[in-house]
UniProtKB/Swiss-Prot annotation:
This is Maximins 3/H3 type 1. Keywords: Amidation, Amphibian defense peptide, Antibiotic, Antimicrobial, Cleavage on pair of basic residues, Cytolysis, Fungicide, Hemolysis, Secreted, Signal. GO terms for cellular component: extracellular region. The modification Isoleucine amide is found at I144. It comes from Bombina maxima (Giant fire-bellied toad). The keyword Secreted applies.
Amino acid sequence: MNFKYIVAVSFLIASAYARSVQNDEQSLSQRDVLEEEESLREIRGIGGKILSGLKTALKGAAKELASTYLHRKRIAEDHEVMKRLEAVMRDLDSLDHPEEASERETRGFNQEEIANLFTKKEKRILGPVLGLVGNALGGLIKKIG
């Protein structure tokens, strides 16, 4: 009879040990998932800060260009440039509200058309820069969204 109790107690101990090992494995996998979620949140936070910095820089550049055109006499060409700059400013402001931006598709700007409004020197500088910035922002928005 003592042998039956020893076997029963041994079986209970073995099953309790197996359950504790299984619980440990589950808690480790849950901890891994939580660590991955935390690192993703950190990456999103860094991406958000970079995007915010780029947005601020672009807003500043657009405001500077707008103020430059305000101080000169407005001709039809300048008026078009101002309209485009205002559209860019609205698009940059929409980055503050991603839920609204995701509802509507972001507009693509015809880089050649914008670049033709500037002189050749400005064209050589701004054309590639606007293209790179547009591609970078598009890539970041896709990754974040």
